A protein has these predicted regions:
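C-terminal alpha-helical interaction appendages
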Residues: 1-70
Length: 70
């Protein structure tokens, strides 16, 4: 059985974190999914999260949300 590559794992975890971050924004603000996605995808955290070398994607979505809110 093939092991997933580091890139595949990073992509999976990043996508999971992004979906959870959108949920958190909606729960906290009551905004639409489109607005929540805009807030997440346009946040400074987005660039940091996509940097595989920084490995921020291994942090929990709750922790990432706290970082995003700062």
């Amino acid at each position: 059985m093939n092991q997933p590559s580091h890139h595949q794992i990073a992509t999976y975890l990043t996508n999971y974190a992004l979906s959870e971050l959108v949920k958190y924004v909606i729960e906290d603000t009551g905004c639409s999914i489109e607005e929540a996605m805009g807030r997440v995808y346009n946040s400074p955290l987005m660039n940091a999260l996509q940097d595989e070398e920084g490995e921020l994607y291994v942090q929990s979505p709750a922790y990432l949300y706290e970082l995003m809110r700062q």
